[in-house]
C-alpha cells in the first residue's frame, strides 16, 4: 500500500521518489533481529560485523504478529516505510537490472491484519504485464459453454498428445488413431478460449520466474508456447462463490468461451445461460492466494478459492444439470406423445436423463448426442452485443430479428425493453445523481455535501524528510484545496434517453409506457437544462 504517494494511477515509482512514506500496516516483530517489519519475512537490511548494512542483504527472519487492537475491525497501525531501500533490496534479490516502467500498487489494505504481499511479486507481475485480483491471483474470464464430445482437430491438439492424456479410445470404443475421431470429454477437462492462450503463457512464465528468483526453486511449467500448457491443471471459479473446481487444459477453441462438461459447469454453480467464469493456473493459486490479504469487509470472502473441489460428484451438483438429455436417439412413441402436448413430467420416464444414471459410471461417461457438427467453434466468435457499437444498433438488431419471427410481436418486445431496462435504469440514475458525493481530484477524499469553500478542506499532509515524512498535518492552514468533481455525471443519467425515444418513435409502445418515459425524460431535462429565466420590469406587465 502506498496511500496517495503514487498519484492517481497508484504507481510505485512516485512513491520511491519520496523515500519514506507513511502507511497503515500490521505490526509484526522479527524473531531474529527483533525489529518491527510488516512483512512475513523481515525486510530490514542485515548488519555485518562492523555494523554496516549492504543493499540487497536483508535479515529475512520470520516475523510474528503483535497483539494490538485484537478486537479492531482492522488491526494495522500507521507506520513509516523506507520505500527506496525496500524496493532496491527487492530488485537486487530478484536479480533484475531495472524496475518495470509501471508497477501498480494499492492505496490501502482492507484485510483484518493488513499484512502486505511481498513487493517482489508485484514487480514480477509488472514485468509480464499481468493484472492481479484482490486475492493475489491472476485470472482470465470466459463464457461458459457446455460440451460432451469433440475431435482432436477441433481443439488444435494432435491425437497422440491426447492419447497421453488418457483419451485412448473414441466414443465408439475404437482405439484413437486419427484427428477426426470423436472423443467424449472427461468431466473435469477444459477447452480454453484461444484468446486466453497468450495470457496463460505469460502467467506461466511469471510463475516460473517467481519460483526461480523469489523462492529459489526450479521452474515448474517451462512453457515456450501455449501448447506446452496442455495437460496442466487449472482452477475454475464462478463469481459470488468461494469454491474452485479442479480442471485440466486439453485444448483451445477459436471463440470467447470455455468448453467443459455440463456437470463441471454445474459444480461451479453455473447453468450456461451467458455467465462468465474465471480460470487460474493451479500453481498460481497455490503460491499467491492467501486468506490474509482478503478484505475484511462484507463480501470480502467471496470470489476467492477458499476451498478446492478435486473430484466431481454428480450427486452433489444442481438438479438442472441432471436434467440433461443423454440419449442417442428419440423413440417413436416420444414423437407421438408430443402430438397430445402432455406435461413434460408425464413422459419423463421415456427419456434418458442424467438423473436416471446416478449411482453408476454412466452418470459421467457414455453420454449420447443426436446431431453431429463439423467444428464446435464455427459459430460467431463474439456476440452481436459486443460487435455492435451503439445501443441504437443493438436495439435495431434485436427488433429486426423480431420482425422475422412470426411468433413475436415487435411492439410488445419494444415496450418490454423500455419498461424493464431503460426506465428502471433512468429512474435509478436520477436518484443516484441527487444523492451523489463529491470527490477531491487531488487527495480522493469524498464529501456527502459540497463544502462552502468549493474546494477540498482536508488538512494537507506534506511528505519528505523529518516530521513531514510521517504525514503530520500542519497546525495552521495548509488545506488540500483540490478541485471537487461529481461522482455521477450527466451523461450517465441521460445515456438511454435518446435510445428510448428512438425505440418508441420507430416501433411503438403502449400509452402507459410512453407517458412514463416522457415523464422521466422531462425530469432529467428539468434537472440539467437551464430554464433561461428573464428579469422582467414593471413595464412588461402593462
Give the ranges of each region predicted by the language model.
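Conserved core architecture of multi-subunit DNA-directed RNA polymerases
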Residues: 1-542
